[in-house]
């Protein structure tokens, strides 16, 4: 059984007991969260597609780690022949969640 769920504007294909990294959101670790924006559910070959969402379908998750930083991304700007160089970098913040259950 799997589902396609929208979490913070991004769509993810999720299955039960799957660990997933999503964009960081403020919540305490271990607290259960329910996502209602379920777009598609596959229940052993029986596929239900929403228009655009499936009414009554939910995905229960819990937060394993509230803040996880991704790899550093470097951004380099340069203008030729002028000596202008600028190097910026940032690390994207993620939250690690665990899919507890998919309810139809």
From Swiss-Prot:
Keywords: Ribonucleoprotein, Ribosomal protein, RNA-binding, rRNA-binding
UniProt GO BP: translation
Keyword Signal: no
UniProt superkingdom: Bacteria
InterPro entries, sorted: bL21-like (IPR028909), bL21-like_sf (IPR036164), Ribosomal_bL21 (IPR001787)
GO CC terms in record: cytoplasm; ribonucleoprotein complex; ribosome
SUPFAM superfamilies: L21p-like (SSF141091)
Disulfide feature: none
Sample GO molecular function, one term: rRNA binding
Stated role: This protein binds to 23S rRNA in the presence of protein L20.
Subunit structure as annotated in this protein's UniProt entry: Part of the 50S ribosomal subunit. Contacts protein L20.
Family: Belongs to the bacterial ribosomal protein bL21 family.
PANTHER family (alphabetical): 50S RIBOSOMAL PROTEIN L21, LARGE RIBOSOMAL SUBUNIT PROTEIN BL21M
HAMAP family: Ribosomal_bL21
Protein name: Large ribosomal subunit protein bL21
Organism this protein belongs to: Azobacteroides pseudotrichonymphae genomovar. CFP2
């Amino acid at each position: 059984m799997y589902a396609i769920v929208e979490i913070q504007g991004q769509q993810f294909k999720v299955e039960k007991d799957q660990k997933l990294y999503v964009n960081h959101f403020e919540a305490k670790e271990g607290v259960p969260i329910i996502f209602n924006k379920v777009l598609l559910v596959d229940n052993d070959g029986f596929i239900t597609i929403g228009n655009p969402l499936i009414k009554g379908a939910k995905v229960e998750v819990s937060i394993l780690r509230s803040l996880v930083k991704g790899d550093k991304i470097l951004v380099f700007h340069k203008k030729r022949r002028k000596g202008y160089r600028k190097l910026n970098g940032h690390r994207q913040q993620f939250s690690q969640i665990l899919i507890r259950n998919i309810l139809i």
